[in-house]
Design a protein with these regions (language model features):
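Catalytic glutamate of the conserved HExxH
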Residues: 148, 152, 156-158
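Bacterial N-terminal signal peptides
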Residues: 7-15
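Bacterial N-terminal signal peptides that target proteins for export
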Residues: 1-6
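N-terminal, motif-rich segments that launch catalysis or mediate targeting to/interaction with membranes
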Residues: 17-148, 162-258, 262-296
């Protein structure tokens, strides 16, 4: 079953997409820098598969373009009335309690990101555990689940994945989602200073995602204010607008990207440690196929 899943997901990775979360450039930047922070016990493995892992970190965005119902897994809409005021304690962190309180339909409508991050953290931990049992396709599963988990962790650091005003539609900032997460990074990538802190192992991906989303939510208003100031008096979002916008939000953008790098590395390390710190092979331990010699 895992082999079939791996093949299916690999095909989807190659599918073209117009949708994005942090933006493909940002997700891949974060993933590359996160690999650099991994400890020596596992860094050689991730370096060996660096190109594949960096490429696959955008897969969850690509899945949505081929009909997978994955949208709710990329956000959590803080700000909706039913969750109360910041820090939104009306929303239980335990999934079963949240479903019981709000119902699955409403919960899904407002986003499932922390629980998806936890699910993929578990998938990665189990993939690491397979190394200790010499399970076929353990290597392939880690190369698959590490970037998939990383994607959802990274989304929690994008402020507009943490608010019901996710595209500035409530405040006259329509389109801000892409301008902040994609356009700024693509235009100014070479000028960004990414300075991640040394990672600490993440032991609870759900709570880590919740905490990151709460921090993201508090950055929404300053970004919206900067957007309005940068576009004031203009009829279009020209180069001058983007330069002004970047100058105003650069500290926020650099900080969230840096923190996403640290969290990505911390989640990978945490999953590996919970799996018992197995030694990682760069080849799958597939069973030997024994063929009977033909009768003479």
């Amino acid at each position: 079953m895992r082999r079939i899943l791996l093949v299916a997901l690999t095909l989807l990775v190659a599918w073209p997409s117009t949708a994005s979360a942090w933006g493909f450039t940002a997700h891949r930047l974060i993933m590359r820098r996160a690999i650099d922070l991994l400890p020596p016990e596992i860094k050689p493995f991730f370096d060996h598969f660096r190109e594949q892992i960096v490429d696959r970190v955008t897969s969850p965005d690509e899945w949505r373009t081929v009909g997978w119902d994955d949208d709710p897994n990329h956000f959590l809409d803080f700000g909706v009335p039913e969750y109360g005021k910041y820090p939104f304690s009306e929303l239980p962190r335990e999934y079963g309690a949240a479903v019981e309180k709000f119902g699955l339909v409403a919960l899904k409508r407002n986003g499932l990101l922390p629980w998806r991050a936890a699910e993929e953290f578990g998938n990665l931990r189990r993939a690491f555990e397979e190394f200790a049992r010499t399970t076929p396709y353990a290597t392939s599963n880690v190369v698959l689940f590490a970037p998939v988990m990383a994607h959802y962790i990274q989304d929690a650091y994008q402020p507009f994945h943490a608010t019901d005003n996710y595209d500035g539609q409530q405040t006259g900032n329509t389109g801000i989602h892409a301008r902040f997460e994609r356009d700024l990074v693509e235009r100014f990538e070479t000028k960004l200073t990414i300075a991640p802190a040394p990672p600490k192992p993440i032991t609870n991906a759900r709570d880590a995602a919740f905490d990151a989303l709460l921090a993201s939510y508090q950055l929404v208003d300053p970004i919206l204010k900067a957007d309005k100031e940068a576009v004031a008096g203009k009829e279009r979002y020209d180069d001058d607008y983007f330069q002004k916008f970047f100058d105003k939000v650069r500290p926020i953008l650099e900080r969230r990207l840096s923190e996403a790098v640290t969290a990505t590395a911390g989640a990978i390390i945490g999953a590996w440690q919970q799996a018992g710190r197995p030694a990682l092979r760069t080849e799958d331990a597939r069973p030997v196929q024994r063929v009977r010699p033909a009768r003479q």
